[in-house]
Amino acid sequence: MARKGILGTKLGMTQVFDENNKVVPVTVVKAGPNVVTRIRTTERDGYSAVQLAYGEISPRKVNKPVTGQFAAAGVNPRRHLAELRLADNEDAGALYEVGQELTAEIFADGAYVDVTGTSKGKGFAGTMKRHGFKGQGASHGAQAVHRRPGSIGGCATPGRVFKGTRMSGRMGSDRVTTQNLKVHKVDAENGVLLIKGAIPGRNGGLVVVRSAIKRGEK
């Protein structure tokens, strides 16, 4: 079965009740509407993919090259463009057509999805917050080293700092994917997905919701 995907906006979290009157924490995602602006096929492009556009934007804010792409597809400019890769044995031309509109209804209640977004930026962070280091002693002679990382390498051996050594630095603002989340409810009337659990990113951030690659749909 071909993987489905849609661009959307994270609106925030809330809680609902299931059929057993148990509280279920859900994230509300405004899914679509998306419009197909380009189709890539294995024969022509060497891989199979579909390009989706999402979000309102004033046409005067779109540069000429991108405006030309939308004009070729015969659709109004959108704020976001994303290309979703399909399996090589899946014919994008048979599954989609340029100008086709995708809504939240491409998913069903109980489906499992992978959600990709940009995590919240935390700014410059130390090793205890960024990597979960224990830190050093609070007493017994410890002098102003309580939150320091400690040694990052020997003097003579190895005589250098290994690549990838965990240190302080900018934390967050990374592309993160949370896998195997269950779609609790599809609200087709409002174009909203209620996804069980938390998803990456801030409220109002762009997310990509795709069929779970490891588990598949229910």
Swiss-Prot record:
GO terms for molecular function: rRNA binding; structural constituent of ribosome. GO terms for cellular component: cytosolic large ribosomal subunit. PROSITE patterns: RIBOSOMAL_L3. InterPro entries: Ribosomal_uL3 (IPR000597), Ribosomal_uL3_bac/org-type (IPR019927), Ribosomal_uL3_CS (IPR019926), Transl_B-barrel_sf (IPR009000). It holds the Pfam family Ribosomal_L3. Gene3D superfamilies: 3.30.160.810, Translation factors. One of its GO terms (biological process) is translation. The keyword Iron does not apply. Signal peptide: none annotated. Keywords: Ribonucleoprotein, Ribosomal protein, RNA-binding, rRNA-binding. Belongs to the universal ribosomal protein uL3 family. Part of the 50S ribosomal subunit. Forms a cluster with proteins L14 and L19. One of the primary rRNA binding proteins, it binds directly near the 3'-end of the 23S rRNA, where it nucleates assembly of the 50S subunit. PANTHER family: 50S RIBOSOMAL PROTEIN L3, LARGE RIBOSOMAL SUBUNIT PROTEIN UL3C. This is Large ribosomal subunit protein uL3. The gene is rplC.
